[in-house]
Amino acid sequence: MAFHEVRFPDNISRGARGGPERRTQVVELASGDEERNASWANSRRRYDVAYGIRRADDLAAVVAFFEARNGRLHGFRYKDWADYKSCLPSQAITATDQQIGTGTGSQQTFQLAKRYASGAQTWVRTITKPVAGTVRVALSMVEQMSGWTVDTTTGVVTFTTAPTNGVIVRAGFEFDVPVRFDSDTLDVTLDFERLGSITTIPLLEIRT
């Protein structure tokens, strides 16, 4: 089992459907009340990319990609067109989009993350697959053009010199979702006009 640092074809993923999934246990009591407990601390995303296939060449590209990943065996990158930036979809990325930590004077590494807030509640999503060339970093709201690097396979930002104590570290970026195929079978249909289709191509988010 390995992770292949290659992205599922963008022209096909653009037409896909899917999104976050949560796992909640709901128990109905004799009184009619409910008890609800979260089984997962974090959400997991599912997608179906069959909707993005529009022509026979798209079908061939998916089959080749599936074979190269050995079905469910190897993970890969996927661009979720509904959520792939550190900012709102209509906005441009800036170096101050997301807070990723606070300097201690000794800590040199910081994990990229994205916050989802509504009301008083916030969920923090760890970003492990930033897109190369899109990451921007700021210290105390001032963009840093040098003095740091980012590992695009882990999402870890490393500073040459540790940010001083109390300095807010922020970042902006595009990112992919680490996924795998959720089936070892592709059910391909080819009609008389040689137009192909696949009923479903499920993808499942994985932890890397």
Question: Predicted regions: what is each one?
Answer:
Residues 63-147, 175-208:
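Extended beta-strand solenoid/passenger and fiber regions
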Residues 160-182:
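Small/polar beta-strand repeat architecture
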Residues 53, 114-117, 158-165, 207:
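Secondary-structure transition/turn motif
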Residues 36-37, 98-99, 158-161:
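Beta-strand-rich interaction surfaces with strong enrichment in secreted/lumenal proteins
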Residues 46, 132-136, 166:
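Exposed beta-strand and adjacent loop surfaces of beta-rich binding modules
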